Amino acid sequence: MQKIPDVTLLMLADLDIPDAVHAVNKSCEDIQWGAAKFLSSKGRPKGLNPNVDYEEVYPIQSINDFNFYCIYNLRNHVETSHSLLIHPDGYVIRPWLWDNTWLEYDYIGAPWRDDPKAYLDPWGKNQRVGNGGFSLRSKKLLDVPSKVTVPWEVNVGNFYKHMDAGLYNEDGNICCHNRHI
């Protein structure tokens, strides 16, 4: 059994609950996390691993609600030095590949495509690392929005120019739009 005591596994889900339960349960196979938590407004789902804590959140009714919650509220569910946020389509499948040196970083996320007109930080530099769908985040990083003013802006700045969709992506906020903070 792999022991990862410094990481809290997190799933935030009000949609696709059966798939979310599968992802959490799979991510807990052969791993002992510092904590594992299923965050939802729908109640503790059936079939959830008994070692996973259920914590109630306000209803997540849109992608903007999800992104807002990740930026400003995930911190309230983490007491370890890091968290691993997973999704129904992005979860742990090879726990033996864990490397404790990853805990030296504030954020590790899957790469975005290489697009010179997208994923730009405030200096116009393309940032490829940041996809939040399966991401390791330090508690220090999660605490930043409560310590400084991190604005909730939609379609502002170079990161959002290519989207023009009225959406706010928490991973883009962390890794590009407000990277300088």
Question: What name fits each language-model region?
Answer:
Residues 129-181:
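Catalytic core and acceptor-binding pocket of nucleotide-sugar-dependent glycosyltransferases
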Residues 80-92:
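Short beta-strand-to-loop acidic/aromatic patch adjacent to the donor-nucleotide binding site
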Residues 90-123:
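Conserved donor-nucleotide/metal-binding helix-loop-beta segment in metal-dependent transferases, i.e.
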Residues 21, 47-49, 93-97, 146:
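Short glycine-/acidic-enriched loop or helix-start segments at secondary-structure transitions
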Residues 30-31, 77-78, 99-103, 137:
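Short, conserved loop/helix-junction motifs that constitute active-site signature segments
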Residues 36, 88-89, 138:
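Generic structural signal for small/hydrophobic residues in well-ordered secondary structure
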Residues 1-67, 73-82:
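N-terminal anchoring/stem segment of glycosyltransferases
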Residues 12, 39-41, 86-87, 109-111, ...:
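Short His-Asn-centered micro-motif
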